[in-house]
């Protein structure tokens, strides 16, 4: 194809991690699907990723190098010079930053501007910290915001401090958006917010391609564990796990055998090491779980590979996304690809991914409605498969690898001036 593209990534793609470790990489992420497609097109790629490791090559056309991992909300001016050097050496036709929620994105914007390459740079909007910060603590009572554990005291951390960090990341994000000429987005929400910050932006629409395993497989009611709810995260407040726990307690009044499964480590562990590692939000979830008598109803699944995650989707009766803010959550797309019935809070860009015929959208921060809709899916029994099938049809269109690759290459050609 004769095009040189520089990628700036928040995390190393699985192929890079595998090259660094010398072992097959089990934790392949969604970016690997795009990377594989681009490598097959003969694009010369330079991948800069946040992390550690020795610079190297995946093949003659694809090289990689680490970017020092420092706090996401503190700008590092020295990165600008490092990026200017990268731009001088590689001379990319296109610069693509996958996300703008880390400080290194602004450093690349500034480096590209000083090198006269800003018109050839595009940034994909993943989440928008400047908007997420506003909803970080939605649904949390005052007593939860005041909780601080030993770990929080030692690290000078708290839920409110985490919200402040998101706001600071958002300030850097806004600076990047104000300077950029081009962004890639995929929802009505990210388009409206990006253009509100910088009306002069050229907004390019391009959906995301998800991890390969989720394109194969079909949810079946007969094969699932009845009344089992699957959620994707309990790690921080914006994912809304506190709301889902409250909803679960209501669901169990009608379905006493209802359970909730979630990836990650248990916040219910009572050993000393676990208690010392616990942050304020986890501590609140612990007390909430005990208060609602849900200790035996919540299952923690630990770290899951893509294949393991897929298995959990297929074993569940419903996928629930209770987040207080999202743009286009990949976990929802994965559930839809498999045809799993979904209930999601109607926040951010979620409605651009799933309509009411393809799933159930709830009002944000409404535990009563969340519980009602989960019960509705349970009551549908095998009839819920029709809704799941509609979701699958929609997701196969949204996350179509061939169509998304074509759109991305068209954007690259436009920016590079190599449209023919």
Where are these regions (language model features)?
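Conserved acidic donor-binding segment of nucleotide-sugar-dependent glycosyltransferases
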Residues: 356, 360-367, 376-381
């Amino acid at each position: 194809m004769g095009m040189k593209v520089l990628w700036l990534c928040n995390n190393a793609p699985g192929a890079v991690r595998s090259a660094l470790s010398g072992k097959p990489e089990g934790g392949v992420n969604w970016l690997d699907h795009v990377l594989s497609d681009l490598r097959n097109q003969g694009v010369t790629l330079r991948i800069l990723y946040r992390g550690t490791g020795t610079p190297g090559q995946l093949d003659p056309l694809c090289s990689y190098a680490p970017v020092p991992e420092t706090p996401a909300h503190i700008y590092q001016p020295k990165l600008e010079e490092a990026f200017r050097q990268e731009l001088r050496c590689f001379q990319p036709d296109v610069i693509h930053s996958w996300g703008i929620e880390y400080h290194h994105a602004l450093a690349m914007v500034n480096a590209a501007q000083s090198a006269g390459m800003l018109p050839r740079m595009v940034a994909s909007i993943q989440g928008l910290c400047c908007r997420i910060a506003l909803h970080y603590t939605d649904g949390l009572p005052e007593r939860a915001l005041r909780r601080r554990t030993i770990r929080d005291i030692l690290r000078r951390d708290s839920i409110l401090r985490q919200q402040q960090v998101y706001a600071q990341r958002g300030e850097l994000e806004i600076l990047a958006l104000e300077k950029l000429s081009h962004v890639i987005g995929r929802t009505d929400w990210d388009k409206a917010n990006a253009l509100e910050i910088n009306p002069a932006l050229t907004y390019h629409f391009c959906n995301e391609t998800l991890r390969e395993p989720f394109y194969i497989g079909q949810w079946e009611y007969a094969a699932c564990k009845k009344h089992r709810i699957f959620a994707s995260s309990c790690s921080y407040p914006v994912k809304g796990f506190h709301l889902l726990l409250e909803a679960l307690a209501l669901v169990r009044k009608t379905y006493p055998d209802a359970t909730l499964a979630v990836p990650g480590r248990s916040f219910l562990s009572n050993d000393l090491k676990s208690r010392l590692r616990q942050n304020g939000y986890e501590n609140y979830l612990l007390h909430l779980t005990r208060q609602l008598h849900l200790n035996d109803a919540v299952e923690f699944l630990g770290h899951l590979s893509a294949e393991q995650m897929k298995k959990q989707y297929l074993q569940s009766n419903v996928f629930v996304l209770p987040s207080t803010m999202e743009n286009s959550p990949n976990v929802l797309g994965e559930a839809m690809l498999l045809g799993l019935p979904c209930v999601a809070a109607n926040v951010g860009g979620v409605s651009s991914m799933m309509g009411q015929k393809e799933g159930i959208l709830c009002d944000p921060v409404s535990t009563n409605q969340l519980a009602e809709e989960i019960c509705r899916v349970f009551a549908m029994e095998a009839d819920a498969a029709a809704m799941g099938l509609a979701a699958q049809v929609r997701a196969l269109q949204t996350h179509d690898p061939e169509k998304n690759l074509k759109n991305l290459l068209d954007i690259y050609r436009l920016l590079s001036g190599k449209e023919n």
